[in-house]
Amino acid sequence: PFLKFATKLMIANYNVPENLAGIIPGLIPFGTILLTPLFGSLYDRIGKGATLMLIGSAMLAAVHFIFAIHIMPVWWFAVIVMITLGVAFSLVPSAMWPSVAKIIPLKTLGSAYSIIFYIQNIGLSLVPVLIGKVNGFDPSYTTSMSIFCAFGVAAIILSILLIIIDKKKHYGLQEANIKK
């Protein structure tokens, strides 16, 4: 949902010319194409899946907080922040999706992934509506970026809970998938 509004954010808050404003948010998908397989391989080799999710979630919250408070309204800073967001967008799924298979029994894994995608698609359909309405009464993007920051904080809390639960139940979220 963030990418839907990111181009206008670049124009409004970072003084990016309209004809170039789409390039900066476009760094995110390009970066995730390169980084997600790299982080997935890292998780396979060193483990620390819940920690990687925690780091990515913290980066996500920090980036949206920075966007909410409008510090350094220059294009090059927006590029740095957007690249950081791309790293976060790569870290979380590269650790999250393989972790599902460690927690959910194989006989219900398909159902678990179905439910995850169901919930994700609810968010992908409703959050843009919410953000669009919020941007209507607050065109500065402070409120909308604060909402995304709150999602990041929720993800931080869930990541910490995963670390705690993994220590108790020994799912192996922090263990490498490739054993030496």
Segments predicted by a language model, with ranges:
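C-terminal transmembrane helical hairpin of 12-TM major facilitator-type secondary transporters
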Residues: 49-96
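A membrane-interface helix-boundary motif in multi-pass transporters
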Residues: 133-152
